[in-house]
């Protein structure tokens, strides 16, 4: 604990270095946001009304974040007010400074604004770029610091507000709140639970809905709606009920979701009342519904209890992965009971561990792919005080390193039954608030005041502040992974002994695999490139034999499997698969696949990587486009 104390900031929660605003001086009792979607101009115009409480009587101005915004007018308490838009500071944007009367206690701040073509939060799609090809489409992604390019705001997770939301659009529109009313082309929403700016969202297009649970609908373009409904209707309500038993009652009333067009850059985004999902989850085998479990878990970790800055992002994502895997465990246990398995609870636990094994592999690959940036961006608690773009630090580290720390804490305090008492207490303690790592650790020690010796055994210095992999690897139950390891080892041994052509490899090897077992099998094969004196490019014949034996991989609808299959074959520098990967990267926008896909292509054939990126660049969301340009050294 002395290490934590030595690093503790003067103020806790820590001041957010990724905002230019003076948010510490204000509380926001409510925000009224109106957005006018102008498809022809590909911009959004709007107004925002802040109901502010002044916390510092000496403050003379409100400073908000903006980025590439046009500010048209400002009023304070109904009167026109002086304002200045400061020079841009990359990558954080421009301060919008607005004078307020001296000794103000409450302020009503009204701003009229328009986005510009350089807005990084929104993407307009022409109708040809949509699945249905009937109407244009708009969607939004504000995390981490892109809300400031949509509307002037305190763009920090440290400050929350309730919202009255409205939008004008010629097409069906959804926002990050509960639908209240529609009058012609006007749409109204209410968000009574306080949320930070990064959870604001809007989507508008040819959108319909279908029921997937008693308190859940799924939205998508009409051509996809039946597939989307089938993918999620089996599990949605069970997910919610398992999470409620673990934490406490779901607070947001409804859990509705929207499957976005393919250019959406993330697997999912935990927008309250409008969970946004990548279409790569629609693989017709329900194997990727765990992403929905992840986004649902954010309803408590991230949305109710929030990291105070992106330096402490692991508090959002590590907790969310932990809850997600407890949901997976609960679903697997229920299925095992229904199937009459001998020890259903052990089976459920083995499924949780199996998911954690996949996550550990992802963490290793992510840190390796960072290269020199691993020193800065692989500690659990980040340092962004030099004004870095939080997007540059985005990786699986806060997710998987964060999960593994919580998993270690669970084991250290006495297992799930003991740790489960802490979970609802923690989320009630910090509900509606934002916190840093120091507050989390303080409350952990306060709650388990009889387990100080056990908690002190955790190497907090290494876990929180040192780059690279965690200091210890948990002892995972490998029951479900062993089959995958054994088959991969058969291939490795046959190749090393030059006997693979005589080996009877066939599709029967993987016939009984669950989809995620194929993921682990392929991950293991890819990992053999780390072995000394082994490189897949020296064993192309083996890769060709694999292609013949496992034809289902080449035609898989599961993006997690297809991506790894392509990565394995491209690591052998097979030219036909370089083109297959390049073409596939033009059909997905999810950065989990797009970024490492281009990085690998760049390693084996830079000319081809740049060719395919230039070919598909206009399809990608601005966030994705910027990150790939950095990955390829094009900026």
Curated annotation (Swiss-Prot):
Substrate binds at residues 141-143, 265-270. GO terms for biological process: peptide catabolic process; proteolysis. GO terms for molecular function: aminopeptidase activity; epoxide hydrolase activity; metallopeptidase activity; zinc ion binding. Binds 1 zinc ion per subunit. It catalyses: an epoxide + H2O = an ethanediol. It is found in: Cytoplasm; Nucleus. Keywords: Cytoplasm, Hydrolase, Metal-binding, Metalloprotease, Nucleus, Protease, Zinc. It is an enzyme of class 3 (hydrolase). The lineage of its organism: Eukaryota, Fungi, Dikarya, Ascomycota, Saccharomycotina. Aminopeptidase that preferentially cleaves di- and tripeptides. Also has low epoxide hydrolase activity (in vitro). Can hydrolyze the epoxide leukotriene LTA(4) but it forms preferentially 5,6-dihydroxy-7,9,11,14-eicosatetraenoic acid rather than the cytokine leukotriene B(4) as the product compared to the homologous mammalian enzyme (in vitro). Its EC number is 3.4.11.-, 3.3.2.10. Its main location: cytoplasm. The keyword Nucleotide-binding does not apply. This is Leucine aminopeptidase 2-2. Belongs to the peptidase M1 family. The active site is at residues 295, 399. One of its GO terms (cellular component) is nucleus. Zn(2+) binds at residues 294, 298, 317. Its cofactor is Zn(2+). The gene is LTA4.
């Amino acid at each position: 604990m002395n290490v934590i104390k030595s690093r503790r900031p003067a103020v806790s929660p820590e001041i957010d270095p990724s905002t230019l605003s003076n948010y510490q001086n204000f509380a926001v009792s409510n925000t009224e946001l109106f957005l006018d979607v102008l498809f022809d101009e590909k911009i959004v115009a709007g107004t925002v009304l802040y109901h502010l409480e002044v916390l510092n009587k000496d403050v003379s101005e409100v400073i908000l974040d903006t980025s590439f915004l046009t500010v048209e007018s400002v009023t304070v308490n109904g009167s026109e007010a002086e304002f200045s838009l400061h020079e841009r500071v990359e990558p954080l944007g421009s301060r919008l400074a607005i004078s307020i009367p001296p000794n103000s206690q409450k302020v009503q701040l009204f701003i009229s604004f328009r986005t510009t073509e350089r807005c990084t939060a929104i993407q307009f799609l022409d109708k040809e770029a949509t699945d249905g090809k009937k109407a244009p489409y708009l969607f939004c992604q504000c995390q981490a610091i892109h809300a400031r390019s949509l509307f002037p705001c305190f763009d920090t997770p440290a400050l929350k507000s309730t919202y009255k939301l409205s939008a004008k659009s010629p097409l069906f529109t959804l926002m990050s709140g509960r639908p209240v009313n529609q009058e012609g082309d006007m749409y109204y929403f209410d968000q009574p639970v306080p949320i930070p700016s990064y959870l604001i969202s809007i989507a508008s297009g040819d959108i319909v809905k279908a029921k997937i649970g008693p308190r859940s609908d799924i939205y998508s373009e009409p051509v996809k709606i039946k597939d989307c409904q089938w993918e999620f209707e089996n599990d949605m309500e069970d997910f919610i009920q398992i999470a409620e038993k673990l934490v406490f009652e779901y607070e947001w009333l409804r859990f509705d979701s929207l499957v976005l067009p393919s250019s959406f850059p993330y697997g999912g985004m935990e927008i309250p009342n409008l969970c946004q999902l990548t279409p790569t989850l629609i693989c017709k085998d329900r194997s990727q519904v765990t992403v929905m479990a992840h986004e649902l878990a954010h309803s408590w970790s991230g949305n109710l209890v929030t990291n105070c800055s992106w330096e402490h992002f692991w508090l959002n994502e590590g907790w969310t992965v932990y809850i997600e895997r407890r949901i997976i465990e609960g679903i697997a246990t229920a299925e095992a009971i229904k199937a009459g398995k001998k020890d259903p609870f052990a089976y459920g636990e083995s499924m949780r561990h199996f998911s954690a094994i996949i996550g550990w592999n992802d963490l290793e690959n992510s840190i390796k792919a960072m290269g020199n940036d691993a020193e800065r961006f692989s500690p659990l608690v980040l340092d962004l005080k030099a004004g870095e773009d939080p997007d540059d630090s985005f990786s699986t580290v806060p997710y998987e390193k964060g999960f593994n720390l919580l998993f270690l804490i669970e084991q250290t305090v006495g297992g799930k039954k003991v740790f489960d008492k802490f979970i609802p207490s923690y989320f009630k303690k910090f509900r509606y608030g934002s916190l840093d790592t120091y507050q989390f650790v303080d409350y952990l020690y306060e709650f388990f005041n009889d387990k100080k010796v056990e908690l002190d055994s955790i190497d907090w210095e290494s876990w929180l502040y040192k780059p690279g992999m965690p200091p210890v690897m948990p002892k995972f139950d490998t029951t479900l992974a062993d089959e995958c390891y054994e088959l991969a080892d058969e291939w490795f041994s046959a190749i090393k002994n030059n006997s693979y052509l005589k080996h009877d490899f066939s599709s029967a090897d993987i016939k009984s695999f669950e989809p995620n077992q194929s993921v682990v099998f392929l991950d293991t094969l890819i990992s053999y490139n780390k072995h000394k004196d082994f490189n897949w490019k020296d064993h192309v014949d083996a890769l060709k034999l694999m292609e013949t034996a496992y034809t289902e991989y080449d035609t898989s609808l599961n993006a997690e499997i297809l991506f790894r299959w392509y990565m394995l074959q491209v690591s052998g520098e097979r030219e036909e698969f370089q083109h297959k990967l390049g073409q596939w990267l033009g059909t997905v926008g999810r950065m989990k696949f797009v970024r490492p896909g281009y990085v690998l292509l760049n390693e084996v054939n830079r000319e081809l990587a740049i060719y395919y990126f230039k070919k598909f660049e206009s399809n990608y969301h601005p966030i994705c486009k910027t990150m790939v340009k950095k990955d390829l050294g094009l900026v």
